[in-house]
């Protein structure tokens, strides 16, 4: 027999789903899809690769949304049929419970796809980490964060490239940059930008005192080569240095690593992942271009502080999330109030509950 609680949940899910459908109007989406597919069948459109790429992305997004709608509609049809049959066969109630769980998962995915609507959300993401004041303890915390994000990306099926790693004197890192490659990598990671705080008994303190450490995370989207960002030669300073090792990896014997400073903004990027100085310079310029592009967008939106997360003070009061090991274990996001006591799981990359809550918190539903 279907329980009262299950019936209430079904009604709530149906109402939630219908509210989302009203936002996008599937009939209008189908008409828009046919129009764009007609445009793409014209050979002339492919002469402008940038425009063709934008249309292709839009087509893929609409198809994903319509596919989700069809799947959720089938879920509700199965539930309705199951409810009728359960009056004669009480055993069907268990099957309905499973379908309800499935439709709940599908609606959540549908909701996230509606939220990830910025044109840049689909892009790869550059993620940089910088420790705050505190020496070895904060350097170690920064490396813990680097591992956390790399593990999260691996769990999501993304590809991770370590572009730059500057080790700390005793442990951890002074700075690091990774490229997370995969669909919607930037969309998922963009709200991770900010200051992250750790409270623990420091393994580097002989007196075993409790320490508070900070590290900042900055995230910018990788941008297409055909997007024009002017970088004047006189506005940059290029330095070369010997690549630093990370666990015995990524070490070159020559001064192949490159650091580029953009003088007007103070933005500094470096790259040492490639074998040649020329390759590292090209990649560093690409990262700089992405940061300057995002900076320009931020100025237009009057949100410079939000985009330039790494330039904010890395200290108390600016943190977006706290990771506490002493006197209790807790990871808490200060924007969404999402929290968990499973510190080890979070540091091993289980970030989805935080990232999904962020997306809902900052949601701007549009197509």
UniProtKB/Swiss-Prot annotation:
Pfam families for the chain: PCRF, RF-1
NCBIfam families in the cross-refs: prfB
Protein name, per record: Peptide chain release factor 2
Annotated keywords: Cytoplasm, Methylation, Protein biosynthesis
Matches recorded under SUPFAM superfamilies: Release factor
Any one of the GO CC terms: cytoplasm
Location of this chain's protein in the cell: Cytoplasm
Residues carrying N5-methylglutamine: 249
One MF annotation (Gene Ontology) recorded for this entry: translation release factor activity, codon specific
Signal peptide from the UniProt entry: none
Lineage per the UniProt record: Bacteria, Thermotogati, Thermotogota, Thermotogae, Thermotogales
Annotated source species: Pseudothermotoga lettingae (strain ATCC BAA-301 / DSM 14385 / NBRC 107922 / TMO) (Thermotoga lettingae)
Keyword Lipid biosynthesis: no
Family of this protein: Belongs to the prokaryotic/mitochondrial release factor family.
Post-translational modification: Methylated by PrmC. Methylation increases the termination efficiency of RF2.
Domain of life the protein comes from: Bacteria
Its biological purpose: Peptide chain release factor 2 directs the termination of translation in response to the peptide chain termination codons UGA and UAA.
């Amino acid at each position: 027999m279907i329980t009262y609680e299950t019936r209430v949940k079904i009604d709530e899910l149906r109402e939630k789903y219908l509210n989302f459908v009203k936002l996008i109007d599937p009939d209008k989406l189908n008409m828009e899809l046919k129009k764009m597919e007609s445009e793409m069948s014209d050979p002339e459109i492919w002469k402008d690769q940038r425009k063709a790429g934008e249309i292709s992305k839009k087509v893929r997004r609409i198809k994903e949304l319509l596919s989700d709608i069809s799947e959720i509609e089938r879920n509700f049809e199965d539930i309705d049929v199951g409810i009728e049959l359960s009056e004669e066969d009480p055993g069907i109630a268990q099957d309905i419970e499973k379908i309800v769980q499935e439709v709940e998962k599908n609606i959540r995915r549908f909701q996230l796809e509606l939220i990830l609507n910025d044109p840049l959300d689909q892009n790869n993401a550059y993620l940089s980490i910088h420790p705050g004041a505190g020496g070895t303890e904060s350097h170690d915390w920064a490396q813990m964060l680097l591992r956390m994000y790399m593990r999260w990306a691996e769990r999501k099926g993304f590809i991770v490239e370590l572009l730059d790693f500057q080790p700390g004197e005793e442990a951890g890192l002074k700075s690091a940059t990774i490229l997370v490659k995969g669909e919607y990598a930037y969309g998922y990671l963009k709200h991770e930008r900010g200051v992250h705080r750790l409270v623990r008994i420091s393994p580097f303190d002989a007196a075993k005192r409790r320490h508070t450490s900070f590290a900042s995370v900055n995230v910018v989207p990788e941008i297409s080569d055909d997007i024009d960002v002017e970088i004047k030669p006189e506005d940059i300073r290029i330095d070369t240095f010997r690549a630093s090792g990370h666990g015995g990896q990524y070490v070159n014997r020559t001064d192949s690593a490159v650091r580029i400073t953009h003088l007007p903004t103070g933005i500094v990027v470096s790259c040492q992942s490639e074998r040649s100085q020329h390759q590292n310079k090209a990649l560093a310029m690409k990262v700089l271009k992405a940061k300057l592009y995002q900076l320009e967008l931020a100025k237009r939106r009057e949100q410079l502080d939000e985009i330039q997360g790494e330039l904010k003070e890395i200290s108390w009061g600016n943190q977006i999330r706290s990771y506490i090991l002493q006197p209790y274990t807790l990871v808490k996001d200060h924007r969404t109030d999402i929290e968990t006591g499973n510190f080890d799981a979070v540091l091993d990359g289980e970030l989805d509950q935080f990232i999904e809550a962020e997306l809902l918190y900052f949601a701007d539903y549009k197509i």
